[in-house]
C-alpha cells in the first residue's frame, strides 16, 4: 500500500525529537496531548496513531489505546509495529484470541521481510519484535487456560533471547511466568 507522506523531513525530525524527549521523561499525558494535536494536523500519518496508542497504554487507557491502534491498522495494516501494538492493545482489553490472530500475522512472516521490508528497522529489531510476539502469545494462551501451549511458547522465547536484542519483557519476568506455568501444570497432574 503506497501512502502519501505529509510530514516534511524537518517536521519528521522535530516530531521524533519531541517524541523521544517526552517518552524518555515519562511525560505520558503531555505526549498524549501532543500526539492528539499532531493527529488532527496530519490525519493520514499512521505512525502518529500507533504512538498515540502507546501513550494511552502507558496511561492505562486501554480502550482508547485499542481505538488508536485500529485507526493505525486502517491506514497501514502491514507495518509489523502497528500489528504488534494492536495485539498489545487487544491483550490489554482481555481480547486474547483476537490478540493471538494478530501475533500470528507477525510470527508467520520471515525474519528478513520484517527486518528489511518496507517498514523494517533492521535485523535486531526484527528479532526483538518477533520474539516478544512469542512471549505475548504465550501470555494470551495462559489467559485462555492453554497451559501447555503457553509453556512451549515461553521456552521458545527464552531460547531465542540474545544479547544485544531488546525485549519489552525482562528475563526475570519471563522466568517467573515460566515457573508459574510449571507449577500450574504440576498441580493439574497431582489433582
Where are these regions (language model features)?
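TPR alpha-solenoid repeat register
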Residues: 48, 82, 115-116, 133, ...
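Conserved structural position within tetratricopeptide repeats
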Residues: 39-40, 70-74, 105-108, 159
Amino acid at each position: 500500500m503506497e501512502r502519501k507522506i505529509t510530514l516534511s523531513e524537518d517536521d519528521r525530525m522535530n516530531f521524533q525529537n519531541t517524541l523521544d524527549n517526552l517518552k524518555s521523561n515519562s511525560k505520558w499525558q503531555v505526549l498524549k496531548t501532543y500526539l492528539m494535536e499532531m493527529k488532527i494536523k496530519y490525519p493520514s500519518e499512521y505512525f502518529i496513531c500507533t504512538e498515540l496508542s502507546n501513550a494511552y497504554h502507558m496511561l492505562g487507557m486501554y480502550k482508547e489505546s485499542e481505538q488508536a491502534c485500529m485507526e493505525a491498522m486502517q491506514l497501514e495494516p502491514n507495518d509489523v509495529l502497528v500489528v504488534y501494538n494492536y495485539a498489545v492493545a487487544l491483550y490489554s482489553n482481555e481480547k486474547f484470541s483476537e490478540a493471538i490472530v494478530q501475533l500470528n500475522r507477525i510470527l508467520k512472516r520471515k525474519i528478513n521481510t520484517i527486518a528489511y521490508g518496507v517498514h523494517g528497522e533492521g535485523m535486531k529489531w526484527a528479532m526483538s519484535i518477533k520474539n516478544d510476539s512469542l512471549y505475548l502469545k504465550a501470555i494470551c494462551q495462559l489467559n485462555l487456560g492453554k497451559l501447555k501451549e503457553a509453556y512451549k511458547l515461553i521456552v521458545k522465547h527464552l531460547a531465542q533471547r540474545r544479547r544485544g536484542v531488546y525485549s519489552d519483557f525482562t528475563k526475570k519476568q519471563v522466568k517467573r511466568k515460566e515457573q508459574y506455568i510449571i507449577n500450574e501444570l504440576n498441580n493439574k497432574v497431582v489433582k
